């Protein structure tokens, strides 16, 4: 009888340790996801602050657009200029 109680208590203690470790792993995973979201948002902000416009970005002259793009005269957005060399 005493051994059954001991085994049951030991099993409950082991279960508590496993659940606690699982909860810690879950919290760590949540932190990683939040970090990834913050890094993506930071990259997006930096992309908006570059000095040239990407494809279909608004422009007023060819100099506003990035390499291999030109400013479309009617719609005022950057389009491919037909070149492909590096």
Swiss-Prot record:
Signal peptide: 1-21
Principal subcellular localisation of the protein: secreted
Location in the cell: Secreted
Disulfides per UniProt: 52-66, 59-71, 65-78
Pro-peptide region(s): 22-50
GO CC term (a single one): extracellular region
GO molecular function: ion channel inhibitor activity; toxin activity
UniProt entry keywords in alphabetical sequence: Disulfide bond, Ion channel impairing toxin, Knottin, Secreted, Signal, Toxin
Tissue: Expressed by the venom gland.
Task performed by this protein: Ion channel inhibitor.
Protein family: Belongs to the neurotoxin 10 (Hwtx-1) family. 17 (Hntx-9) subfamily.
Annotated protein name in UniProt: Omega-theraphotoxin-Hhn1c
């Amino acid at each position: 009888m005493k051994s059954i109680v001991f085994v049951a208590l030991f099993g409950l203690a082991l279960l508590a340790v496993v659940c606690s470790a699982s909860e810690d792993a879950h919290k760590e995973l949540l932190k990683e996801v939040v970090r990834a979201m913050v890094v993506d948002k930071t990259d997006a902000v930096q992309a908006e602050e570059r000095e040239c416009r990407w494809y279909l970005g608004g422009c007023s002259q060819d100099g506003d657009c990035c390499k291999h793009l030109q400013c479309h005269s009617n719609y005022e957005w950057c389009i491919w200029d037909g070149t492909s060399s590096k």
